[in-house]
């Protein structure tokens, strides 16, 4: 099977790539994995979802044992030993990987500026997260496969405003 020829120019545009904020989180010291997961799913997520929709967030995922979100408990981290090889030899020890996907950086900044966010969510992070050890990064994401099908960008996502 031959591989397709790459395009002559970089065809990535604002229509087929999105920004993704990734939070590599640690749970608060002394908190169990189960208590962390429960707080994220039953308290933090319900508080956060509507605010994200209000400001145009396209996708938010959190890695946890519950099927709707994903955390990185010891149980699943140990699966890495089955696929480790010389290229994939370092296992991340974060408790949570949260990703927020949006088209416009200003949309995410509006969330952080929202008075409701400041009143209800900023302080809540201290209840479950080790905010001193957790890390963040942001970058463009481009989609190549969606639900088992090769795609061109983000078909079906709302276009730029």
Swiss-Prot record:
Pfam families, per this entry?
Answer: EthD
What EC numbers are recorded for this enzyme? 4.1.1.-
The entry's keywords: Lyase
Q: Where is the EthD domain?
A: 29-131
Where does this protein act, in terms of pathway? Secondary metabolite biosynthesis
Q: Which reaction does it catalyse?
A: atrochrysone carboxylate + H(+) = atrochrysone + CO2
What is the top-level taxon of the source organism? Eukaryota
Q: What happens when the gene is disrupted?
A: Impairs the production of monodictyphenone, but leads to the accumulation of endocrocin.
Q: Which GO terms describe its molecular function?
A: lyase activity; oxidoreductase activity
Transmembrane annotation, as ranges: none
Family recorded in the similarity comment:
Belongs to the tpcK family.
**Protein purpose:** Decarboxylase; part of the gene cluster that mediates the biosynthesis of monodictyphenone, a prenyl xanthone derivative. The pathway begins with the synthesis of atrochrysone thioester by the polyketide synthase (PKS) mdpG. The atrochrysone carboxyl ACP thioesterase mdpF then breaks the thioester bond and releases the atrochrysone carboxylic acid from mdpG. The atrochrysone carboxylic acid is then converted to atrochrysone which is further transformed into emodin anthrone by mdpH-1 and mdpH-2.
- Please identify the protein, giving its name as recorded: Decarboxylase
Species source reads Emericella nidulans (strain FGSC A4 / ATCC 38163 / CBS 112.46 / NRRL 194 / M139)
Provide the organism lineage as a comma list: Eukaryota, Fungi, Dikarya, Ascomycota, Pezizomycotina
Gene name for this UniProt entry: mdpH-1
